[in-house]
């Protein structure tokens, strides 16, 4: 059985084709095509511009995916699309494309929860059996565990997502959005040597990111680091003595601020993930979502998991970052249980909770 998946909840448009062999063997990725809308440095991506990008590219990506998979339209069993959550206009553009293909090809539709898509793709690629899931992206920050045919949310951000926090600080520093602002923050953070004190906000199983962003934005403004910088290395030579005879402390660089932001927010994520592991008795962590590609986050989570006698599972950028193949995978799992999305119900929603989905394909 073959599913084609369309993903476009944010600035990445993905088309994936997944084969589920009839003998029940491991599913195979036949195609995983993606194109990203990149906004200018210092700017985020607006819904209308992102939707225009998706409309412009979706036909060519579908054709390319079919060619790469070496299949014809007749081989496709169902068309899966991201129903939500995400940005309204981009979601609508993908839903329209899915409905159009359904009518043209005479194939059934399957609306997929974006978050569940990440989880199921992560489970397939890594082989994680029943992990605590840390789902971290530009729009979501959740700690999840499976129970009674639902992916239960044990903790989440109380305001903005961790990826949103990193992306917005990249805008403050006027860092390039190519290939992604969060990735460029990560690379800059590797050069950081000074840990700047930032708010640390964990409330039980939940966390908050907006205060940290406000604090580090203020620091960047105080030290004149917001906006374009001619040369990052120039900042390192500015050394300012601390009062009352303490050790010398230099003016922080942009790299120091990126390093400090990552260390702080990732420490918070490790804490709430560990608390969930203790609660459900799991020794596995699965990190999914775009921020899950961050090597420092994986390293910090790995240290915690090993201390508990456990392990961390993560995927590379092919499957961690938004993609169509994860929608095809989750959609096919639902399709095989008999789930269908009638044409008149093939809408999309910006608010679609992970625990709203009845996970019929798991025990």
From Swiss-Prot:
Obligatory cofactor(s): a divalent metal cation
Instruction: For this UniProt record, give its keywords in alphabetical order, as a comma-separated list.
Output: Activator, Acyltransferase, Cytoplasm, Metal-binding, Nucleus, Transcription, Transcription regulation, Transferase, tRNA processing
Annotated binding of a divalent metal cation, by residue = 114, 118, 135, 322
GO CC, any one term: EKC/KEOPS complex
Supply the InterPro entries for this chain.
Answer: ATPase_NBD, Gcp-like_dom, KAE1/TsaD, Kae1_archaea_euk
Q: Name one GO biological process term.
A: tRNA threonylcarbamoyladenosine modification
The positions annotated for binding substrate are 135-139, 167, 182, 186, 294
Q: Where in the cell is it found?
A: Cytoplasm; Nucleus
What EC number is given for this enzyme? 2.3.1.234
The reply on keyword Transcription regulation is yes
Q: What is its main location?
A: cytoplasm
Q: Which reaction does it catalyse?
A: L-threonylcarbamoyladenylate + adenosine(37) in tRNA = N(6)-L-threonylcarbamoyladenosine(37) in tRNA + AMP + H(+)
- Which cysteines share a disulfide bond? none
Cofactor remark from the record: Binds 1 divalent metal cation per subunit.
Q: Which GO terms describe its molecular function?
A: chromatin DNA binding; metal ion binding; N(6)-L-threonylcarbamoyladenine synthase activity; nucleotidase activity
Role played: Component of the EKC/KEOPS complex that is required for the formation of a threonylcarbamoyl group on adenosine at position 37 (t(6)A37) in tRNAs that read codons beginning with adenine. The complex is probably involved in the transfer of the threonylcarbamoyl moiety of threonylcarbamoyl-AMP (TC-AMP) to the N6 group of A37. Kae1 likely plays a direct catalytic role in this reaction, but requires other protein(s) of the complex to fulfill this activity. The EKC/KEOPS complex also promotes both telomere uncapping and telomere elongation.
What's the family? Answer: Belongs to the KAE1 / TsaD family.
Q: What is the annotated quaternary arrangement, including any partners?
A: Component of the EKC/KEOPS complex composed of at least bud32, cgi121, gon7, kae1 and pcc1; the whole complex dimerizes.
Q: Which PANTHER family match?
A: TRNA N6-ADENOSINE THREONYLCARBAMOYLTRANSFERASE
Name-wise, this protein is tRNA N6-adenosine threonylcarbamoyltransferase
Source organism: Emericella nidulans (strain FGSC A4 / ATCC 38163 / CBS 112.46 / NRRL 194 / M139) (Aspergillus nidulans)
Q: What is the lineage of its organism?
A: Eukaryota, Fungi, Dikarya, Ascomycota, Pezizomycotina
């Amino acid at each position: 059985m073959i599913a084609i998946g369309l993903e476009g909840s944010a600035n990445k448009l993905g088309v994936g084709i997944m084969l589920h062999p009839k003998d029940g063997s491991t599913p195979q990725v036949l195609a995983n095509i993606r194109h990203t809308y990149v906004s200018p440095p210092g700017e985020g991506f607006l819904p209308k511009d992102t939707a225009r990008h998706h409309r412009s590219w979706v036909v060519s990506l579908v054709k390319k995916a079919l060619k790469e998979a070496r299949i014809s339209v007749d081989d496709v069993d169902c068309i899966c699309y991201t129903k939500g959550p995400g940005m309204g206009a981009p979601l609508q553009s993908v839903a329209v494309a899915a409905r159009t293909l359904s009518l043209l090809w005479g194939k059934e539709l399957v609306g997929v929860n974006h978050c569940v898509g990440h989880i199921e793709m992560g489970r397939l690629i890594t082989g994680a059996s029943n992990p605590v899931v840390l789902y971290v992206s530009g729009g979501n920050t959740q700690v999840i565990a499976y129970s009674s045919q639902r992916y239960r949310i044990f903790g989440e951000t109380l305001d903005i997502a961790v990826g949103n926090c990193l992306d917005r600080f990249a805008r403050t520093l006027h860092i390039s959005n190519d290939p992604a602002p969060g990735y460029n923050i990560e690379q800059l953070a590797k050069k950081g040597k000074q840990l700047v004190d930032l708010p640390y906000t964990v409330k039980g199983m939940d966390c908050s990111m907006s205060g940290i962003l406000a604090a580090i934005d203020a620091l960047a403004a105080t030290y004149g680091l917001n906006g374009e910088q001619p040369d990052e290395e120039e900042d390192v030579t500015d050394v300012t003595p601390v009062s009352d005879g303490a050790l010398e402390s230099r003016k922080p660089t942009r790299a120091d601020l990126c390093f400090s932001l990552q260390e702080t927010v990732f420490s918070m994520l490790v804490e709430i993930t560990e608390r969930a592991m203790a609660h459900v008795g799991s020794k596995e962590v699965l990190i999914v979502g775009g921020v899950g590609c961050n090597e420092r986050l994986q390293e910090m989570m790995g240290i915690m998991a090993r201390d508990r006698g456990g392990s961390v599972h993560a995927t590379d950028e092919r499957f961690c970052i938004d993609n169509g193949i994860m929608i095809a995978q989750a959609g096919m799992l639902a399709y095989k249980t008999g789930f269908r999305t009638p044409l008149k119900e093939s809408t999309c929603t910006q608010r679609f909770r992970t625990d709203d989905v009845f996970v019929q394909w798991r025990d």
